[in-house]
Amino acid sequence: MATRITNKGLSKSSKAWMKEHLDDHYVQLAQKEGYRARAAYKLLEINEKTNLIKKGMTVVDLGSAPGSWSQVAGRLVGDEGILIASDILPMDALENVTFIQGDFREEAVFDRLMSEVGDRQVDVVLSDMAPNTSGHTAVDQPRMIYLCELAVDFALRVLPKGGSLVMKVFQGEGEQQLRQQLQSQFSKVRTIKPAASRPRSKEVFWVATK
C-alpha cells in the first residue's frame, strides 16, 4: 500500500521543499507521462540537442535508479537496442533492460559491467551518478569528481571512436581540471544545462564524443 506524504512533522525547510517539489512542472509532467522521475526530461532535452541515442544502439546507464533515464534511453533504442543499467540502489525492472545492482566504485561491480558488455560495441555511456550529498561542498565535490573520473575511465574502455559519454558534473573545485582531462581524451566536449535542471543547482551535463 502506498504511503501518503503529508506535511505533518516536517521542518519549515522540508515543507518548503515539499511544496516546491509537488508544484514543480517537471514533477507533474513525469507523473502524467509515466516517467519515474523529473530527470527524464534532462535526458530528453540533451538527446533532442545532440541526437546521440538512436534505434538499435547499445547504451550503458550508470547511476540509473530510479530508472527515468533508462526509460528514456530504452524507448529511444527500441526493441532492437541493448540497455545495461547499474546503480548502488535497487531499481524496479524495466522491459529489455539488464540491471546490475552494486557500488560502481567497487572493482567487482565494474567487472560485472564489463562482463555484461562483453564484445558489444557500446554507442553511448550515460552517467547521472552523484554522491549522497552532505551539504558540505568540501566533502561532496571531491566525491562527485571521483565518480566522474570512474565514469570517464569506463567510457574510455568501452566506447569506440565516435561513441559518446553523457555525464552529470557539479560545477566547482576540480571541475576545470576534469574538463581539461576530458578534452585531451575525447575529440569534442560540450556543456548542456537542461531546462529541467533547477536554476540553483550546480549540475551541468557534459557530452563528450570520442
Swiss-Prot record:
It is found in: Cytoplasm. Coiled coil: none annotated. NCBIfam families: PRK11188.1. The keyword Acetylation does not apply. It comes from Psychrobacter sp. (strain PRwf-1). The gene is rlmE. The lineage of its organism: Bacteria, Pseudomonadati, Pseudomonadota, Gammaproteobacteria, Moraxellales. This is Ribosomal RNA large subunit methyltransferase E. Signal peptide: none annotated. Belongs to the class I-like SAM-binding methyltransferase superfamily. RNA methyltransferase RlmE family. Its EC number is 2.1.1.166.
